[in-house]
Every structure is written in C-alpha cells, then in structure tokens.
From Swiss-Prot:
Protein name, UniProt field: Glucose-6-phosphate isomerase
Active site, renumbered: 345 (proton donor), 376, 490
UniProt function note: Catalyzes the reversible isomerization of glucose-6-phosphate to fructose-6-phosphate.
GO biological process: gluconeogenesis; glucose 6-phosphate metabolic process; glycolytic process
Source species: Erythrobacter litoralis (strain HTCC2594)
NCBIfam families per the UniProt record, alphabetical: PRK00179.1
C-alpha cells in the first residue's frame, strides 16, 4: 500500500462515527448534499423526452469528512487514470491481456472499437428486421440458450421491457437441468420457434448441451432443417459456422466484451427481437448517457464513484459482509440476481491486479428481492438482526400497470417507509420494557428513484452499476474483468464425468450414490 493510500485510509478511519439521526440534526443541508438527480438528454422509444433517476445517499453515514478521505483515496489509486484506460480501450484486464470494451458497444470508447461495434449492431439490426419481416417464416417463439451474462442480462431486460405483448415470445434457458429446457419446449410450437445460441467461446458445456437438445427437439417435431432455425451470438464465429449455423445468422461480438458486460452486444439479440429494436436502442442510449456522466464527473460528483465510496466505507470501516438490493418494481425482479453476478464475479477476489494480497475485505455478498414480498421474508433481519446490511432501494415514480393507482401508491409508501424505519428505529411495545419490539435503527440505505422504468432509464441504471463495480475495483486495486474462480469446479466436473481422477472420500461417496461412478 502506497503512502498516499495509507494516509487516505487513516483519514477515513479517524472520522468520528455518528448515528444517522445525529448526522441529520447536525446538517440541515444533508439531503441536498447527498441527493443527486441525473436526467437524460435523449428520447425514450415512445418519442417523449426520457426522464431520469434521483439518487439519494443521505440515509448513509457518508459525511463531508469521509468524502474528503475517499476522494484522496481515489487520487492515490489513480482513479482518473484507470477510468481513462477503461474508456480508451487500453488493456485494463491485465491478467488476460485485453481491453474491456463494453462501453464501446453503446458509443463510448476508442474510435476504431466504436466503429466496429456500430457495424456489428447494423448486422444485428438487419437480421432482427428480416425476422420481423417474415424472412424466416412465421416466428412466434425464441428459445435463447446461454448461461451467466449470456442469459441473465437479456432476461432482466425482457422482464423489464415486455410488460405489453412481446413481438416474439422469448424463453431464456440457462440451467443444464433438463427441466428448464422442457418447460420452454412446452410453451413453444416447433414450427414457429427459433433457437438462439449465446456463448462467447461457443464451447460452454451447459449452453452447447442445451443447444444440441433444442435442435433434437426441432428435428423430432417435424423441422427438417433445425440448423436453419438457429441464430448464433458469439465472439467465436468460426466455431458457430462449424457447428452448422449459416454465416448470415451468426452475430459476432468483440472478444474484449466480457460475459457479464455483454448485454449491449449481440447477446442483446433476444431483447431486440422480443421487445423491439427501438427498445434495445433505447437501452444503449441510456447506458451511453451514464457513460458520459461517468467519464466527465470527478470526485463525489461522479455518482458511480460516490456509490463506491459508500460501499467501501461499509465493508472496510464498518465490517459489513453483505449488501442488499430491493427493487420495488416487479419488472426488476431479476435485478438483484444480475447485480449479484456483476459485483461478486467482478470483485470477489483475494488478490489485487498486481498479484499481491488485497488489503482488506473485497466484494460483499450481494443479495436482495422484490418489493413488499421481501418485507414479509427478510426484513426482520434487516431491522432487528445482528448483521448490519446496507440496503439499496430502487423504485419508479410512474407505475408499470394500468390498475387502480392505489396499488402503486401503497408500493411506494412501503419503499419510503422501510428506509425511514431502518434509519430511525423505534419502540412498538405497549410496555416499553419489551425488548423484542424495539428497533435499534441506524441501519443505512440508499434510494434510486426513477421517473419511469423505460428502456433509456433501464440502460442507465444497469450502466450505473457497471461503473460502480469498476470504481470499487479501482479503489481496492482489483481487476474486475477476469473470473478465474469459476474454472476449478468446472475442471473437476469434467474429471468426475470422465472418471479419470480420484477425489476425497466424501465426493467419491456422493458420486457412487448418484450412480455416476
């Protein structure tokens, strides 16, 4: 750790710990200092000017003194230099020797990379338009097989953007468990179904096994040329062609786009096909708007960086091992899962980018749920448990339904009430000596309040969390773009399948009990 980094952390640790209520009492401008609204200068797919998001960190323990310390830490870790490397296409993924160019897919990056991304997007749009125009016959269903970032991002976007009837009914299948694929088959007519195979390498065992079974399903149900119903989304187009996919239906994406950051590439094909090209393009526009903010704002004015300051304060100063996200919007039901992969796969590391051990705790356990469902399941622990868990609340001012406005009013009042209750605490006992009804309070939360959950806002929201994850990584000295932690278990699974390796007695017994020996 450099002297500048040590000095910054020393300053952060010296800041007096005060309760949230004390912080509000001490500063009448606290809300205005720690609440920031970002609005987009772009139109939503519906033609109206898109709105924005209000970010509120006033219910966290951040103070001017803490922010001064974290800004010094950002300088010590050369955050500005790391940001420039990310956005200019430098090889910032040092362990794998390549760039991380997901922002280039939406127009922010090295000129040559942006031009390549635009060309690839044009190719995808042409295919989407052709399918919608009947070039592949009647298409009512798409079975999209992928795993990890190749599946979770598209499914999140489709859930958020296809409340109205989808242009094409999309079923995203990621699990190797055959039940998942059979459920998709049951909902689709083989004669009007396409298969999308999403795999960066086109070798991922779960995806390729599911793809082979999907082709077999088409063949055994009267489709003479099942490969003629396949679209491939990959950074290895040669492998897709070798698999039997016609080159005109192979949609490549750049090798420098990581899986969990790949929604913006051809991996977004099912979103464009199911929700419409305008919706997909709206997501790109919203993400680019967030890119522009991230690229230009400095210090605490940079909202993804400000979020990272709060994250690091709770993990490294307050010792929090988890952070929760609760979406008070049914359309964002998969957002906690998406963030779980984004943050834990990116920053769940024990060594820094230079190979030395990390200096403290890294990514917390990211978890969460949906709205009032979660209140009746896990909020007991948040309010009265022994774990201090910072919470992010996400909601939309505009409802996503056409029902009685009472539905949405109750939803929002619950969202805001939970943040207030976590902070203030209270005593609900008729007898004040009953400790079981005491709420200690001083539990931190942040709120992200969207004007509306349209495609532009969704893109901005996802990009915000990407940049937040990157900012955390820079401040910890981590490379967030590799994921070697997923490899060992995959290798051992192959060894069990081949029967060519000895394992511990417990694993051997399980293999035998399952009849796999």
């Amino acid at each position: 750790m450099s002297d500048a980094e040590t000095n910054a952390w020393d300053a952060i640790h010296r800041v007096e710990k005060r309760t949230l209520l004390e912080l509000f009492d001490a500063d009448s401008e606290r809300v205005s200092k720690l609440s920031h609204r970002l609005a987009w200068g772009v139109e939503s797919p519906g033609g109206q000017e898109a709105g924005g998001i209000l970010f509120d960190w006033s219910k966290t323990h951040l103070t001017d003194e803490l922010l001064d310390g974290f800004e010094a830490l950002a300088d010590a870790m050369d955050f500005a230099g790391a940001r420039e490397k990310l956005l200019s296409g430098a090889k910032i993924n040092v362990t794998e020797g390549r760039a991380a160019e997901h922002t280039a897919q939406r127009g922010t990056g090295a000129e040559a990379s942006v031009e390549e991304a635009v060309a690839l997007m044009g190719r995808m749009k042409a295919l989407v338009d052709a399918i919608h125009g009947g070039a592949m016959g009647e298409v009512k269903h798409l079975i999209h097989v992928g795993i990890g970032g190749s599946a979770l991002g598209p499914k999140l976007a489709l859930d958020a953007l296809t409340r109205d009837l989808a242009l094409v009914d999309v079923h995203v299948v990621s699990n190797i468990d055959g039940v998942a694929l059979e459920q998709a088959f049951a909902a689709c007519d083989p004669a009007t179904t396409l298969i999308a195979i999403a795999s960066k390498t086109f070798t991922t065992i779960e995806t390729m096994t599911n793809a082979t079974s999907a082709l077999h399903w088409l063949k055994t149900n009267g489709v003479d040329d099942p490969h003629g119903r396949v679209v491939a989304l990959t950074a290895n187009p040669e492998a897709a062609v070798e698999f039997g996919v016609d080159e005109t239906r192979v949609l490549p994406f750049m090798e420098s786009v990581g899986g969990r950051y790949s929604l913006w590439s051809s991996i977004g094909f099912p979103v464009a096909l199911g929700a419409g090209w305008d919706e997909f393009e709206g997501m790109l526009a919203g993400a680019q708007a967030m890119d522009e903010h991230f690229a230009s704002a400095d210090g605490r004015a940079n909202l993804p960086l400000l979020a990272a300051f709060a994250d690091l304060y709770y993990t490294r100063v307050r010792g929090c091992q988890a952070r929760a996200c609760f979406a008070y919007d049914e359309r964002l039901g998969l957002l906690p899962d998406y963030l779980q992969q984004l943050e834990m796969e990116s920053n769940g590391k024990r060594v820094k980018a230079d190979g030395t051990p990390v200096d403290g705790p890294t990514a917390p356990i990211t978890w969460g749920g949906v709205g009032t469902d979660a209140q009746h399941a896990v909020f007991q622990l948040l309010h009265q448990g022994t774990h201090l868990v910072p919470v992010d609340f996400i909601a939309s001012i505009a409802p996503g339904d056409d029902l009685d406005p009472a539905h949405h009013r109750i939803l929002l009042t619950n969202c805001f009430a939970q943040g207030a209750a976590l902070m203030a605490g209270g005593n609900m006992a008729a007898d004040e000596k009953d400790p079981a009804r005491v709420f200690p309070g001083d539990r931190p939360s942040a709120t992200m309040l969207c004007d509306d959950l349209d495609a532009v806002t969704l893109g901005a929201l996802i990009a915000f969390h990407e940049h937040r994850t990157f900012a955390n990584a820079v401040l910890m000295g981590i490379n967030p773009f590799d994921q070697f932690g997923v490899e060992l278990g995959k290798k051992m699974a192959k060894d069990i399948e081949s029967g060519g390796a000895e394992f511990d007695a417990s694993t051997q017994a399980l293999v035998g009990a399952a009849g796999l020996a």
